[in-house]
């Protein structure tokens, strides 16, 4: 009987460990923070913020991790010039918003009308949302979005005009 009990507990432990591995995660080698930490850090540093909404099982997210976020130039640009935040659109993890309100990542995504992943929301250094892009974005597109914000083009030109001149 003791052997059966050990086997049952070992099975439960393995299931819990496997379930932990099923959580959505941002790409490796990027300094993604929780939304709460990123908003604080961006405000203190006066840097723009990139908010990445993803979820476990998102095939387009995996494709971006493999084909886009592996680019060394993009990695360097985003890590250097942005504060990066990641929100799992299916997570019940609790977060605290800038106004002090507590909510879950899932509720925050729904409230912000994030219905597909990946979705990227770019914020100015003043923490104003500038634009949102849903779905697969190429390396070149992500670099153009970064340039548009970091070089201040958003202050005098719509994104579409900036992109048409590239």
Describe each region flagged by the PLM.
Residues 1-11:
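Bacterial N-terminal signal peptides that target proteins for export
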Residues 31-49, 78:
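A short beta-strand-turn-helix
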């Amino acid at each position: 009987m003791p052997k059966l009990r050990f086997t049952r507990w070992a099975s439960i432990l393995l299931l819990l460990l496997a379930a932990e591995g099923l959580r959505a995660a941002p790409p490796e080698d990027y300094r993604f923070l929780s939304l709460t930490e990123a908003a604080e850090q961006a405000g203190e540093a006066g840097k723009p913020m990139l908010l990445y909404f993803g979820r476990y099982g998102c095939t387009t997210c995996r494709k971006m991790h493999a084909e886009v976020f592996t680019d060394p130039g993009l990695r360097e640009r985003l890590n250097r010039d942005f504060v990066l935040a990641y929100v799992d659109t299916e997570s019940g993890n609790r977060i605290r918003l800038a106004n002090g309100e507590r909510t879950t990542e899932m509720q925050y995504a729904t409230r912000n009308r994030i219905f597909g992943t990946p979705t990227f929301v770019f914020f100015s250094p003043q923490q104003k949302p500038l634009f949102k892009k849903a779905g697969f974005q190429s390396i070149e597109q992500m670099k153009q979005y970064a340039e548009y914000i970091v070089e201040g083009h958003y202050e005098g030109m719509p994104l579409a005009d900036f992109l048409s001149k590239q």
